[in-house]
C-alpha cells in the first residue's frame, strides 16, 4: 500500500509538471532569439513541480479550470447511475423484494470487484515504476564506471585539466571535485575555447544542476514529456554556456569557436555521456547559435525578464 501511495503522489506531481513543461516549451519558442540563459532559467519551475506536492496557483492560473475532484466524481458516475436506477425501480414497485435484494447484493459485489481490480492494477504499475528506477540507476552506475575506466590514465595538462587518448570529446567529470578532460588531438586554440567552455560549467555549478535533474528524471521516467524537457534543458544549458564563452573571450571568436565544436563532433565516437559529465552534444544547433549570437541590449534583457516573470 505504501508503494502505491508513493507512486500516486509522484504521478500527481508528474501530471502537474507536464502542464508547466508544455508552457515552458511554448515560452522557449517565443523567446528563441533571447539569450539562452533565459531559456535555461525557465526550466526551474518544472524541476520544482516535479518534487513539490504543494501547489502555488494564482487566480489567473489555467489550473483553476481543472478540478481534480471532478475526475474522482466521474469515476463513480456509472456506478451511481446504476444504484439510483435500482432504487427507483424498488420504490416504484417494479421489482420484487427478492430481486431487489439480489440487485443490491450484485451492486455491492461489483463495487468490491472493481475496487480489487483497481488496487491490483495500481500495485502492478507501482512495481513496474520501481523496476524502471532500478534499471536507470544500474545504467548510471555502469556508465560512470565505464567512463572512469577510460580517464583514469589521463595526464595533467594544467590546473584541473587533464588530457586522455581514450576519449574523443571534452567534458567535466566529477561531483565533489570536478575535473576537465580533453582529448589529446586538440590544437592549442581549440584547447583555449573548449577549456573555457568547461570552466563556465564548473563556475555555474552546472554539474550539480544536471545530476539533480537526472535523479528527478529517474523518478519520473514513465513521463515522455519529462524526457523531452531534460533534453531541451541540457541543450539550453550548453548553448547558454557557449554564449558565456563568447562574452568572456569576445564575439570575434565565433568562427574559430564553431570550428572547434565541429571538430569535436566529427571526432566523437562512443564516449559514454552520463549526468556527471558534459560532453559536446547537439552541435548543429549550438554552432548556429554561436554564429548568430549578438550581445543583447540591456533594454531587451529587461523586457524578456519581465515577460518571463509575468
Residue ranges and their predicted role:
Residues 2-78, 111-310:
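Membrane-embedded and juxtamembrane structural elements of multi-pass membrane proteins
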Residues 82-116:
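Low-complexity, acidic polar-rich segments
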